[in-house]
Amino acid sequence: RLGVGIGWNHVEYEALGENFSNRGRRSEEQVKLLRELWTKDVVDFTGRYHRVNHAGINPRPIQQTIPIWFGGGADRVVRRIGEQGDGWFPQFQPDSEGQERIAMMRQFAKDAGRDPMAIGIEGRIPFGDGDPDIWNKAAAAWDEAGATHLSVNTMRAGLQGPDQHIEAIRKFKEAISG
């Protein structure tokens, strides 16, 4: 899968000479273009931001199609996921507010003629202090909210070096796998 996020730091866009304010609309167009390039021998595409004249990529990806997962949680991102996304890396917890965001995304998918249950959701659980009870409660909450995938975030857990992070991920997997 390909993860797509439009970013929040305007300085990154300024450094590239790009307009920060249209980054979302540009990314929507880019996703349409990518999907055409991945699936067609030759593409003719004219959008607001991009134009491709009788070109293609070779070799094309073996996997058809590459799932595109979006990150974020702003209203426009939620709409983008419902209309274009194959999955979502939400930036919230699976509480009542998070469940409202998921319901909103699913409605946008229905409105776009898509199956909302075909859009994956990856719940992210902080490693925290390494408490399996907390992880399992969080995993159950994400399951109830409709998450199709889970990940653990080991950042800011006081771990040192790759080996400790890898061991933390193993511990998490064992704890929630039962």
Regions found by a protein language model. Give the residues of each.
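Active-site-adjacent structural elements that line small-molecule/cofactor binding pockets in enzymes
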Residues: 1-178
